[in-house]
């Protein structure tokens, strides 16, 4: 990639292509697909999302033991969360697309190769995370297919209610297994996108903050400039910071409620899967299948917490850069402007979910402890039922 031509939105191209396939990002009305996109969206979402959700939910309601309830809940709750996330993306789509213009505006403000290299490194990191999640989900789907193939009796990848008799006939079983696996592959694509797009946006915000910190730290050094020129440069940097804050607040509005639900959903999934694996009577392939699901769900939340801390970390670097610039030799007006920027930089860029819960590694640790507490409670219920 040419270092002189940096486009931050390149990291988002695959995400929005997948969202278009998912039926929530319509193309132009002049195209054939655009004119029929509404019908396509309805067919796709009913077939691959609503039907599979109904199957999971009915199977959950038909649970007749704590073990089967836990096995069903650990797939029903995350899938419900993904559907809510998809609805949220559709609701906030216009605002998220408009943020691309702000990213391109920040790209134009890059002043040297070092800053461009920072942005390129962020794009490469986001693409690496996307590829890694894709490989993890692919391994999970492949393992599920192996589990189906190796099973001694007709079974599906995850516990599902099917409204017809699919166990007694080989042809009915094969058709059902193929349909079910295809639907889960479509949902795996959805999970890939919904798991990685928040991290991509957060990484882009963090690297642009880092590039701005580099620009600010160089203020006042090098060849002397007139006071008016220095003030104009600083005003430009303040505007850049305001754009970054707008991006961050836009992300917070887009992710807040779904992230709050994600913490709860992941904790429940961890608790129920661990209970099923520890106390359920399962074979090795079924054990591995559910274990991979546990790893995927936990990694998704871990990734969100990790990337949510990046803007906060780079915000602290920007604060340090404000102190590091050569402000002593500048005019009084310059110092006043710098104090305004300093005051705003002192407010940390902490992403908050559900108004009160910060998205951070500390919250992730609390979630793990909560899952362990619920697992202990389920174990006590199991012991009581056995007595």
From Swiss-Prot:
Superkingdom per UniProt: Eukaryota
**Pfam families this protein is in?**
7tm_6
Residue ranges spanning the membrane: these are 41-61, 72-92, 128-148, 172-192, 255-275, 286-306, 337-357
Q: Name one GO biological process term.
A: signal transduction
Q: What is its main location?
A: membrane
Q: Which InterPro entries match?
A: 7tm6_olfct_rcpt (IPR004117)
- Name the keywords, alphabetized: Cell membrane, Membrane, Olfaction, Receptor, Sensory transduction, Transducer, Transmembrane, Transmembrane helix
Q: Does the keyword Glycoprotein apply?
A: no
Role description: Odorant receptor which mediates acceptance or avoidance behavior, depending on its substrates. The odorant receptor repertoire encodes a large collection of odor stimuli that vary widely in identity, intensity, and duration. May form a complex with Orco to form odorant-sensing units, providing sensitive and prolonged odorant signaling and calcium permeability. Involved in the preference for citrus fruits for oviposition, especially through the response to valencene, the primary ligand of Or19a.
| Protein known as | Odorant receptor 19a
Tell me the gene name.
Answer: Or19a
């Amino acid at each position: 990639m040419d270092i002189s031509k940096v486009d931050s939105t390149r990291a988002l191209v695959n995400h929005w292509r997948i969202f278009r396939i998912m039926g929530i990002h319509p193309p132009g009305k002049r195209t054939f697909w655009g004119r029929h996109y509404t019908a396509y969206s309805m067919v796709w979402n009913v077939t691959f999302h609503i039907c599979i959700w109904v199957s999971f939910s009915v199977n959950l309601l038909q649970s007749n033991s704590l073990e089967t309830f836990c096995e069903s809940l650990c797939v029903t709750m995350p899938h419900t969360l993904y559907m809510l996330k998809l609805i949220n993306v559709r609701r906030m789509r216009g605002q998220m697309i408009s943020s691309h213009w702000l990213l391109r505006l920040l790209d134009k403000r890059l002043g040297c190769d070092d800053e461009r290299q920072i942005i390129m490194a962020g794009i490469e990191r986001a693409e690496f995370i996307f590829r890694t999640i894709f490989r993890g989900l692919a391994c999970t789907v492949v393992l599920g297919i192996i589990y189906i193939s190796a099973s001694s009796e007709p079974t599906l990848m995850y516990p599902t209610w099917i409204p017809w008799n699919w166990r007694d006939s080989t042809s009915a079983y094969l058709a059902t297994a193929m349909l079910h696996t295809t639907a889960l592959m479509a949902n795996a694509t959805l999970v890939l996108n919904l798991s990685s797009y928040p991290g991509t946006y957060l990484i882009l915000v963090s690297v642009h903050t880092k590039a701005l910190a580099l620009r600010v730290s160089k203020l006042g050094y090098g060849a002397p400039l007139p006071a008016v020129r220095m003030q104009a440069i600083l005003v430009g940097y303040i505007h850049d910071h305001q754009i970054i804050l707008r991006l961050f607040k836009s992300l917070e509005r887009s992710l807040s409620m779904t992230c709050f639900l994600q913490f709860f959903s992941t904790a429940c999934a961890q608790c129920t899967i661990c209970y099923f694996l520890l106390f359920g009577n399962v074979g090795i392939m079924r054990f591995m299948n559910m274990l991979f699901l546990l790893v995927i769900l936990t990694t998704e939340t871990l990734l969100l917490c990790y990337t949510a801390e990046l803007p906060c970390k780079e915000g602290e670097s920007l604060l340090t850069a404000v102190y590091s610039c050569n402000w002593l030799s500048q005019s009084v007006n310059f110092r006043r402007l710098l104090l305004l920027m300093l005051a705003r930089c002192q407010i940390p860029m902490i992403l908050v979910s559900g108004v009160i819960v910060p998205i951070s590694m500390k919250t992730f640790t609390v979630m793990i402890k909560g899952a362990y507490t619920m697992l202990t409670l389920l174990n006590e219920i199991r012991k009581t039922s056995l007595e």
